[in-house]
Regions:
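Bacterial N-terminal signal peptides that target proteins for export
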Residues: 1-12
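An anionic, turn-rich surface loop/hairpin at beta-sheet edges
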Residues: 73-100
Length: 134
């Protein structure tokens, strides 16, 4: 085997293994948790469940990254408050979830109406303890 090809074999093999842990087929994020200081982004086959300290959200489409590692998907977002829940509390609003994935790190931003939250820095397979507002 020529020397330049031999030098690339190990790095390419390592990249293939690492990419397989983050992506399923077609750059769709593989199922599993991504966690930050105040958020857990749980990727599931058909989207994601998002849990914040005082809110919850949902994305109902598989998270497929573009060629730059970005996604921009619609979802829902609902605030949670302290104390007992009342009728109408936590009603889900339309939201926009934008993210960028590079290796095992995700930058996430959530927009609800004119309110922008983030960016949050998340790490694959991290599941932090959230201090809930309940």
């Amino acid at each position: 085997m020529p020397r330049p090809i031999r030098r690339l074999t190990l790095p390419l093999a390592l990249f293939a293994v690492a990419a397989g842990t983050v992506f399923a087929a077609d750059r769709t994020l593989a199922a599993g948790p991504w966690g930050g200081d105040t958020v857990i982004f749980e990727v599931v086959a058909d989207g994601a469940h998002v849990e914040f300290e005082c809110a919850r959200g949902r994305i109902d489409k598989a998270i497929t990254l573009d060629g730059k590692g970005d996604f921009d998907l619609p979802g829902t977002f609902g605030a949670e408050g302290r104390g007992p829940a009342r009728d109408g509390d936590g009603a889900a609003a339309n939201a926009r979830y934008r993210g960028h994935v590079e290796g095992d790190t995700m930058a996430l931003e959530v927009t609800v109406g004119d309110r922008r939250m983030g960016p949050f820095t998340l790490t694959r397979d991290r599941r932090p303890f959230l201090k809930k507002c309940r």
